[in-house]
């Protein structure tokens, strides 16, 4: 069956970016039921929405990575998430050594635990906090920022950068001609990149002459002939990828996990009483609200039929992993957070040879941060006077999380 035989999909013409940013689940629930692979006009792209189709496309030899148009406009080339072949192999060999489990285990506790404790000390005696801004995001960005070598950049600036890059990357709407519907929406991403370069260029100058153990210093030198370094223009797109995706994912993942646990008070109590359950709570939080919801894509390298749809060579497909993780064909009552759900694999970190390189690091940042939070404030409660609003289609998480506790 081809898309021309699906007149019932005319409703997709009315879907807007605002609708997807506010709540993509309604649209994607219908897509999963009616057309697991469908062309969505506002995105100018085919979209995969079920677990089966997302995994099939992500792992198929008939597809390779491609960056979305808005992502390419934001990051430039060669960004690690959108390249293939020798360039992808080189970039993965550049970033992966510092993220190997044996390497992460060597320093993760000493890196993250003092950061988490430092932020907790600022509010643990107040009896109230907004955890996204005061804890989850700062711990996430500070942990990665220090790993990269950006100790001189304060956490609020790192949060500002990833927010601006996020809005630029997800400025995905196109008009009937396939042109960006809101080209001015890339301006703040350009501003963030200019600020990033103003800070990082002098550091790169220093690291070229005086290498240290920071990640970006290793990116410059590792695997290169003596006396040579990778060109900064070659690594900047991947720096931007890290400053967006890798900066926000642990923060939004732990915030979503907390919101999920607050929806099941008895499960929150279990996790507080038994911290060994924290990794399981995080895995369910990532499935329940995937931080990287629909930000990656593939492109067909030959004519192929997927989910009954004939795709010519050169057809991009967006992979909506957040939708795949709500697939009723795989998960029972997927819109409900459930710590005791059978531990099935999820797609929050992607699949195939472009799966997230930082899975182990991100999981341990979240684990340590929640361990410290529950140890310091075991009687944490959501402040029900304040609502919880989730936002985002490419990247998704709670915009705020107000909590209270007795001091």
UniProtKB/Swiss-Prot annotation:
Q: Which Pfam families match?
A: p450
Pathway assignment reads: Aromatic compound metabolism
Q: Which domain of life is it from?
A: Bacteria
Keywords from UniProt, A to Z, are: Aromatic hydrocarbons catabolism, Heme, Iron, Metal-binding, Monooxygenase, Oxidoreductase
Q: Where does heme bind?
A: 88, 92, 298, 321, 351, 354, 356
What one GO molecular function would you report for this record? heme binding
What does the entry give for GO biological process?
catabolic process
What cofactor does this one take?
Answer: heme b
Name the Gene3D superfamilies for this protein.
Cytochrome P450 (1.10.630.10)
Q: What class of enzyme is it?
A: oxidoreductase
Q: EC number(s) of the enzyme?
A: 1.14.14.-
Q: Which reaction does it catalyse?
A: guaiacol + reduced [NADH--hemoprotein reductase] + O2 = oxidized [NADH--hemoprotein reductase] + catechol + formaldehyde + H2O + H(+); 3-methoxycatechol + reduced [NADH--hemoprotein reductase] + O2 = 1,2,3-trihydroxybenzene + oxidized [NADH--hemoprotein reductase] + formaldehyde + H2O + H(+); anisole + reduced [NADH--hemoprotein reductase] + O2 = oxidized [NADH--hemoprotein reductase] + phenol + formaldehyde + H2O + H(+); guaethol + reduced [NADH--hemoprotein reductase] + O2 = oxidized [NADH--hemoprotein reductase] + catechol + acetaldehyde + H2O + H(+)
Where, by residue number, does substrate bind?
241, 245
Describe its partners and assembly state.
Answer: Monomer. Forms a heterodimer with GcoB.
Q: What does this protein do?
A: Part of a two-component P450 system that efficiently O-demethylates diverse aromatic substrates such as guaiacol and a wide variety of lignin-derived monomers. Is likely involved in lignin degradation, allowing Amycolatopsis sp. ATCC 39116 to catabolize plant biomass. GcoA binds and processes the substrate with electrons supplied by the GcoB subunit.
Q: Which family does it belong to?
A: Belongs to the cytochrome P450 family.
Record's protein name: Aromatic O-demethylase, cytochrome P450 subunit
> Which organism is the protein's source?
Amycolatopsis sp. (strain ATCC 39116 / 75iv2)
Gene that this sequence comes from: gcoA
């Amino acid at each position: 069956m081809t898309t021309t035989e699906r007149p019932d999909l005319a409703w997709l013409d009315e879907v807007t970016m605002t609708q997807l940013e506010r709540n993509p689940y309604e649209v994607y629930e219908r897509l999963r039921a009616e057309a697991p692979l469908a062309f969505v006009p506002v995105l100018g792209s085919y979209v995969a929405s079920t677990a089966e189709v997302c995994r099939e496309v992500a792992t198929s030899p008939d597809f390779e990575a491609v960056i979305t148009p808005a992502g390419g406009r934001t990051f430039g080339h060669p960004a690690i998430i959108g390249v293939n072949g020798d360039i992808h192999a080189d970039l993965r060999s550049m970033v992966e050594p510092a993220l190997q489990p044996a390497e992460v285990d060597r320093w993760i506790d000493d890196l993250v635990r003092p950061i988490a404790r430092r932020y907790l000390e600022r509010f643990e005696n107040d009896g109230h906090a907004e955890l996204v801004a005061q804890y989850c995001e700062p711990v996430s960005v500070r942990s990665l920022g220090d790993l990269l070598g950006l100790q001189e950049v304060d956490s609020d600036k790192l949060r500002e950068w990833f927010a601006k890059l996020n809005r630029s990357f997800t400025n995905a709407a196109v008009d009937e001609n396939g042109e960006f519907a809101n080209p001015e929406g890339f301006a703040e991403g350009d501003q963030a990149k200019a600020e990033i370069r103003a800070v990082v260029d002098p550091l790169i100058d220093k690291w070229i002459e005086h290498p240290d153990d920071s990640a970006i210093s290793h990116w410059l030198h590792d695997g290169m002939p003596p006396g040579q370094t990778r060109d900064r223009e070659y690594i900047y797109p991947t720096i931007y990828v890290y400053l967006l995706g890798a900066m926000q994912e642990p923060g939004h993942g732990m915030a979503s996990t907390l919101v999920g646990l607050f929806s099941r008070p008895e499960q929150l109590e279990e996790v507080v009483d038994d911290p060994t359950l924290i990794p399981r709570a995080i895995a369910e939080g990532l499935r329940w609200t995937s931080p990287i919801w629909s930000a990656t894509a593939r492109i067909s390298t030959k004519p192929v039929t997927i989910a009954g749809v004939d795709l010519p060579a050169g057809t991009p497909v967006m992979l909506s992993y957040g939708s795949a993780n709500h697939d009723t064909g795989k998960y029972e009552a997927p819109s409900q957070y459930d710590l005791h759900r059978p531990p099935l694999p999820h797609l929050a970190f992607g699949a195939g040879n472009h799966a997230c390189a930082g899975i182990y690091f991100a999981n341990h940042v979240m684990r340590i941060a929640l361990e410290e939070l529950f140890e310091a404030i075991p009687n944490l409660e959501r402040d029900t006077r304040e609502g919880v609003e989730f936002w985002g289609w490419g990247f998704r998480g709670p915009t705020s999380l107000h909590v209270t506790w007795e001091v």
